[in-house]
C-alpha cells in the first residue's frame, strides 16, 4: 500500500522530469502521451487505494524536531488524490489536442506534471509544513502556467498578479504555522489535533485566522479574488486544472483538514461562513453580465467556492468536501468545452459574437449542457445533490439569512449558466467563422468528466459513509429546501432561455449603471490599481531615484576616498609607515596565537 501511495505521488514528478528533458526541443507528441499515461497511473493508484479504504502513514525521515517528512493516507487525502488524479488525467490527454500546434508543447507538459505533483504533495502531507511546501509549489506552477505565453504583456501581468496576491495571503498562513509550532511544539496533524483543546483559546483564534487568510488567497476569496478571473489568460487546460482540482481547492482542503481547530473557534468559523455566502452571490452577480466565455466560468468557480466555505464554516466539512468533488468534475468539463469553442472560433471569447454553434459543435454543446445543468444544480446531475446539502444544512442549522443568500445565488447561477448556453449555441450566429468540432482525443478526454457530472451525486450516501472515519456525518436533506432549490434553479434556467431566445435585453442595457458596476467587477480592480498599485509604483520610483542619486553616489564617494587613501599609502615616501603597520600587525597576531 505504501508503494502505491508513493507511485501515486511521484508519477507526475517523473512526468515533469521526463518532459523537462525535451523542454527546449521541438514539439514531440510522444512527450504528451507518456506524461498523460504517467498521470493516469497516479490516478489509478489513488483510486485503488480509495477502494481499499485503508488508512496508513508513510514516514520517510525527520526534517527537524517535531516535524517528520511523511504522508497521511486517509479518507480525506484519498478523496482529494482521486479527484486530482481523475481531472488531471483528463486535462493531460485533452492538452495533446489543445496544445498540438504550440511551440512550447513539451514545456507545457513539464509544468503540468509539476503542478499535479505539488497538489498531491499538499493533500498527502501529514503535517502543516509539508502542506505549505506543496502550497507554495502550486503557487509557483500557477505562475508558470498562467503566464505560459509570457511574451504577451497582459498574460504576464495576470501571472504576476496571481503570484503576488497569493504571496501576500501566504504570509498570513506562514505566521499561523509558526505560531502553531510555538504553541504545540509540533506541526504533525495528529499531534496538533490531539492537544488542540489544551491550547490557549486566543492563540487558537489567531492561528485559525492566519491559516484562513492563506486559504482566502489560494481560493480567491474576497478581497483576494481579482486574480482568479484574470488567470484566464493562461491556456484553457490550465484553467480547468486550477479551477477544478488544484490551486483554488487547496484553501477549502486546508479548512477541512484543520476542522478540529476550527471546531474550537466557532467565532472564526462563522466569519468563514458569512464570507462564503457573500462571495457566492457577489461572484454570481458579476457572471450575469460578463461577455468573456472563460471569465463567466471563472466567476462560477468563485461562487461555488463560496458555497464550500459556507459548508465548512458551519461545520459541515464532509458536505464541503462532497461539493468540492462534484464541482471538480462538471467545472473541468465546462472549461474543456470552452476550449473546444475557442478552438472552433479562432480563440475568440466574446459570447455576444458567437451563436449558432450547436450544429457544428453538437457534441461539445451536449457536453457543456450537461456541465451547465450540474452547475445550476438541476436534478439528477451531480451539482444538485451537493449544493442541495449545503442549502439544507444552512437551513436546518437556523442560519436562515445565509440560506436565503445561497438560494438567490442558486437562481443567479442557473440564469448565467443558461445565458452562456443560449448565446453560444442556441441563438442565431453573429460571426463569420467556419467552426468545426474538436478532435476525437479531446472529446474522449472529456467523456469521464461528463459521466461523473451526471452520476457522482448518486454516490452521496456511500461517500459520507466512507468519510465517517474522519468527519462526522450530517444528514442535511430537507424536502422544503430541495423544492425551493429546484424551483430557483429551474426558474433561473427558464428565464434565461426565454430572455435570450426573444432578445429581451437590448444593447442599450450596457449603458445602465448597474450593468456598468457589474461588468467592471464593482470597480474593485480599478480601486486596487489607483490606491495600491499606483501608490506602490510611485514609492518604487522614489526609491529608484534614491538608489541612483543618493546611495550610488555615496558608494562612489566612499570608493573614491578609499582609492585616494590607498594611493597615498603606497607612495615610496610612505615605506616607513607601511613597515610600522606590518610590525604592529605581526605583534597583534603573535599575541592572539599566545592567548589561544
Curated annotation (Swiss-Prot):
Keywords: Cell membrane, Membrane, NAD, Quinone, Translocase, Transmembrane, Transmembrane helix
Substrates-to-products reaction catalysed: a quinone + NADH + 5 H(+)(in) = a quinol + NAD(+) + 4 H(+)(out)
Main location: membrane
Keyword Protein transport part of the UniProt annotation: no
Matches recorded under InterPro entries: NADHpl_OxRdtase_5_subgr, ND/Mrp_TM, NU5C-like, Proton_antipo_N
Keyword Lipid metabolism: no
Any one annotated GO CC term: plasma membrane
Pfam families: Proton_antipo_M, Proton_antipo_N
Major enzyme class: translocase
Subcellular location: Cell membrane
Membrane topology: Multi-pass membrane protein
EC number: 7.1.1.-
Gene Ontology terms: biological process: ATP synthesis coupled electron transport; electron transport coupled proton transport
Coiled coil ranges: none
GO molecular function annotation: NADH dehydrogenase (ubiquinone) activity; quinone binding
TM annotation in the entry: 4-24, 31-51, 80-100, 104-124, 162-182, 204-224, 236-256, 270-290, 305-325, 365-385, 395-415, 441-461, 480-500, 576-596
Family of the protein in this entry: Belongs to the complex I subunit 5 family.
Role description: NDH-1 shuttles electrons from NADH, via FMN and iron-sulfur (Fe-S) centers, to quinones in the respiratory chain. The immediate electron acceptor for the enzyme in this species is believed to be menaquinone. Couples the redox reaction to proton translocation (for every two electrons transferred, four hydrogen ions are translocated across the cytoplasmic membrane), and thus conserves the redox energy in a proton gradient.
Protein name: NADH-quinone oxidoreductase subunit L
Organism name: Campylobacter jejuni subsp. jejuni serotype O:2 (strain ATCC 700819 / NCTC 11168)
Amino acid at each position: 500500500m505504501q508503494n502505491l501511495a508513493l507511485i501515486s505521488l511521484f508519477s507526475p514528478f517523473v512526468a515533469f522530469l521526463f518532459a523537462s528533458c525535451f523542454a527546449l526541443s521541438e514539439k514531440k507528441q510522444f512527450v504528451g502521451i507518456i506524461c498523460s499515461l504517467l498521470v493516469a497511473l497516479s490516478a489509478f493508484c489513488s483510486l485503488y487505494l480509495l477502494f481499499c479504504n485503508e488508512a496508513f502513514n508513510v514516514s520517510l525521515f525527520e526534517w527537524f524536531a517535531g516535524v517528520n517528512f511523511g504522508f497521511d493516507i486517509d479518507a480525506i487525502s484519498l478523496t482529494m488524490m482521486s479527484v486530482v488524479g481523475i481531472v488531471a488525467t483528463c486535462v493531460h490527454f485533452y492538452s495533446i489536442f489543445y496544445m498540438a500546434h504550440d511551440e512550447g508543447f513539451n514545456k507545457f507538459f513539464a509544468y503540468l506534471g509539476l503542478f499535479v505533483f505539488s497538489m498531491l504533495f499538499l493533500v498527502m502531507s501529514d503535517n502543516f509544513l509539508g502542506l505549505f511546501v506543496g502550497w507554495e509549489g502550486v503557487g509557483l506552477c500557477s505562475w508558470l502556467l498562467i503566464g505560459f505565453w509570457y511574451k504577451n504583456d497582459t498574460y504576464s501581468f495576470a501571472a504576476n498578479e496571481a503570484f503576488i496576491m497569493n504571496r501576500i495571503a501566504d504570509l498570513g498562513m506562514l505566521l499561523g504555522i509558526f505560531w502553531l509550532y510555538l504553541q504545540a511544539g509540533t506541526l504533525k496533524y495528529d499531534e496538533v489535533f490531539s492537544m488542540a483543546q489544551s491550547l490557549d483559546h486566543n492563540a487558537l483564534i489567531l492561528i485559525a485566522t492566519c491559516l484562513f487568510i492563506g486559504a482566502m488567497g489560494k481560493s480567491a476569496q474576497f478581497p483576494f479574488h481579482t486574480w482568479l478571473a484574470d488567470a484566464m489568460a493562461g491556456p484553457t487546460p490550465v484553467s480547468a486544472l486550477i479551477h477544478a482540482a488544484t490551486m483554488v481547492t487547496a484553501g477549502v482542503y486546508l479548512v477541512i483538514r484543520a476542522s478540529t481547530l476550527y471546531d474550537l473557534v466557532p467565532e472564526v468559523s462563522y466569519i468563514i461562513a458569512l464570507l462564503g455566502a457573500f462571495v457566492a452571490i457577489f461572484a454570481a452577480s458579476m457572471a450575469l453580465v460578463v461577455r468573456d466565455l472563460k471569465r463567466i466560468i471563472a466567476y462560477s468557480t468563485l461562487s461555488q467556492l463560496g458555497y464550500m466555505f459556507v459548508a465548512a464554516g458551519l461545520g459541515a466539512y464532509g458536505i464541503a468536501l462532497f461539493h468540492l468533488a462534484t464541482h471538480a468534475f462538471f467545472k473541468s468539463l465546462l472549461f474543456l468545452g470552452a476550449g473546444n469553442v475557442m478552438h472552433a472560433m479562432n480563440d475568440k471569447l466574446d459570447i455576444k459574437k458567437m451563436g449558432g454553434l450547436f450544429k457544428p459543435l453538437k457534441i461539445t454543446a451536449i457536453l457543456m449542457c450537461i456541465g451547465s445543468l450540474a452547475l445550476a444544480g438541476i436534478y439528477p446531475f451531480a451539482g444538485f445533490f451537493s449544493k442541495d446539502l449545503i442549502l439544507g444544512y444552512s437551513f436546518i442549522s437556523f442560519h436562515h439569512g445565509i440560506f436565503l443568500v445561497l438560494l438567490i445565488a442558486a437562481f443567479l447561477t442557473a440564469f448565467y449558466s443558461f445565458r452562456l448556453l443560449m448565446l453560444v449555441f442556441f441563438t442565431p450566429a453573429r460571426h463569420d467563422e467556419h467552426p468545426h468540432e474538436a478532435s476525437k482525443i479531446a472529446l474522449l478526454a472529456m467523456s469521464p468528466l461528463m459521466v461523473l457530472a451526471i452520476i457522482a451525486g448518486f454516490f452521496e450516501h456511500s461517500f459520507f459513509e466512507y468519510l465517517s472515519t474522519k468527519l462526522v456525518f450530517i444528514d442535511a436533506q430537507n424536502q422544503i429546501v430541495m423544492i425551493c432549490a429546484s424551483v430557483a434553479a429551474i426558474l433561473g434556467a427558464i428565464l434565461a432561455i426565454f430572455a435570450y431566445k426573444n432578445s429581451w435585453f437590448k444593447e442599450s442595457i450596457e449603458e445602465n449603471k448597474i450593468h456598468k458596476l457589474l461588468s467592471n467587477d464593482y470597480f474593485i480592480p480599478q480601486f486596487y490599481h489607483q490606491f495600491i498599485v499606483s501608490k506602490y509604483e510611485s514609492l518604487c520610483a522614489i526609491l529608484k531615484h534614491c538608489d541612483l542619486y543618493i546611495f550610488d553616489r555615496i558608494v562612489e564617494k566612499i570608493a573614491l576616498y578609499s582609492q585616494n587613501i590607498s594611493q597615498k599609502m603606497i607612495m615610496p615616501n610612505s615605506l616607513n609607515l607601511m613597515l610600522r603597520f606590518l610590525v604592529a600587525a605581526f605583534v597583534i597576531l603573535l599575541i592572539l596565537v599566545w592567548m589561544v
